[in-house]
Amino acid sequence: MYCSAMPEAASAPAVRATIGDSEFDRDTALTRRAPGVYDIDLSAGWTIISAVNGGYLLAVLGRALVDTLPHGDPFTISAHYLTASRPGPAVVRTDVVRTGRTLSTGQASLFQYDDEGREVERIRVLASYGDLDALPDDVRTTARPPAIPPLEHCFGPEDGPAPVPGSSALADRLMLKLDPSTLGWALGKPSGKGEMRAWFGFADGRDHDPLSVLLAVDALPPTAFELGLKGWVPTVELTVHVRCRPAPGPLRVSITTRNLAGGFLEEDAEVWDSAGRLVAQSRQLARVRLG
């Protein structure tokens, strides 16, 4: 259940974290062991139930590729989620596929050891990087920002008197305020429309950059909830296109599902910044439990 009163958490923190010095930056930081080999301890703070969030994992691999490639901004990144990642030690291995004047392409994989001591690949990524600041200013688009009510009229997990279904450790690290028209699932009255919209930010006040956008596309409750489904909705594949560097301030995220078939659905996301620019688009294929 959600209540109408807004919590103090909706206001900006007294001391805002900065890009490069925030919980997100610390928890996605890697230690280079050798060229193309990185160690990381995946934080339990970015989990849903016990599984590590896919957007957080994408940001981890995205950061490894920043160190590997000569260009620093992800333009397009596609990930296949092979097995569920767990909090704890992991190894990321990267390779350069091709380098060019404006774009560089690389691949990365994250590995962990299973209970039998075998190394298991968790996620594999192929990505192209460039320089977002070098792109021309010309924009020709029919896309429009989502019509989300003002932040003070939206609601987050902390607004209810009891934990919201699907709440997680991830939610504690975010400033997430959902459009009331996409909250029917939390009241036991899902709309059936397969839509989710929200204001998105970090609880510590950190502004956004291309790596945090990789988290934003996969941080909202699943659209499956508004379709009347419950339970875990694991990502099979996720592709993100980063279109420009985000302006300071919260992001608006809109996610839509049009087709659920055979136990799978797509989630198409748009991420808009405070300047009204479309900063990222994504599509993911996810598995759902029917019945």
Spans of model-derived segments:
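Terminal targeting signals and extreme-terminal segments of soluble enzymes
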Residues: Y2-G291
